[in-house]
């Protein structure tokens, strides 16, 4: 009696394939509950498509996608912090790319894990975390495997912001540019203007962007008629009108 997600596999996979063709350098994101599909399902789909890199949210999710059969590179999107023991254990894994968002963390990794693969995160208008434009010139990767620069843009990606930040970053240390939330036109313009490898992280648009391929079903256990003003549910809200309340399994 559980809620079930039903997938029109052919339609869903066609959508995913089309996005891979439209966005060269696409990196699938598999994090949290796997956008409702499960991390194992997404890891297997990425492997089926022969993607070279999979993005996860946290270091703890690496084992889950590997258990599902993923055997290529993994970038951990949560920036590394010294207190994260799981992330620290993974740093020297040659297939792990660690995101670094503070100069002091970059310095520590350079000293203690000189062969680690890292991506430097830039501060955007999201104001989450990242190296500020003023700090870019202080970035010293040393012997680290520098995999480029990453930025987390607002849902409506800002091409001008992405170009400005990326241009300043690659002028200091040339490398790939990892972005999110740009539409296809802006992404192609950015690729052309920067002249470096670009990677597009994609989660929601990739996995949930074909709603016609998805449907849900559930078992209805009871239907109760309630009158206007009757309290119901955990929060005891009042019914705005006479209606039926379904209880599903």
Which ranges hold each PLM region?
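Active-site-proximal beta-alpha core segment in soluble small-molecule metabolic enzymes
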Residues: 3-7, 11-13, 24-168
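Active-site anion/phosphate-binding pocket segments in diverse small-molecule metabolic enzymes
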Residues: 5-8, 13-16, 28, 80, ...
């Amino acid at each position: 009696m559980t809620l079930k997600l039903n997938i029109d596999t052919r339609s869903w996979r066609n959508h995913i394939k089309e996005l891979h063709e439209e966005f060269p350098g696409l990196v699938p994101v598999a994090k949290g509950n796997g956008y409702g599909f499960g991390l194992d399902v997404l890891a297997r789909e990425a492997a089926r498509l022969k993607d070279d890199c999979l993005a996860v949210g946290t270091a703890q999710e690496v084992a889950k996608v590997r258990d599902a059969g993923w055997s290529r590179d993994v970038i951990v999107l949560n920036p590394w912090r010294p207190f994260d023991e799981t992330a620290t254990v993974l740093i020297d894994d040659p297939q792990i790319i660690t995101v670094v968002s503070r100069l002091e963390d970059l310095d520590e990794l350079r000293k203690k894990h000189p062969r680690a693969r890292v991506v430097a995160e830039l501060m955007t208008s999201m104001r989450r975390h990242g190296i500020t434009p003023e700090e870019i010139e202080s970035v010293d990767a040393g012997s680290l495997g520098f995999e480029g620069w990453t930025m987390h843009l607002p849902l409506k990606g800002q091409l001008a912001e992405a170009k400005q930040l990326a241009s300043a970053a690659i002028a200091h240390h040339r490398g790939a540019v990892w972005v999110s939330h740009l539409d296809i036109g802006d992404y192609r313009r950015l690729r052309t203007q920067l002249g470096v490898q670009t990677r597009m992280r994609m989660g929601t648009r990739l996995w949930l962007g074909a709603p016609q391929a998805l449907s849900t079903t559930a078992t209805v256990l009871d239907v109760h008629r309630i009158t206007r003003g009757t309290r119901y549910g955990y929060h005891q809200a009042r019914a705005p009108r006479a209606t039926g309340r379904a209880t599903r399994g």
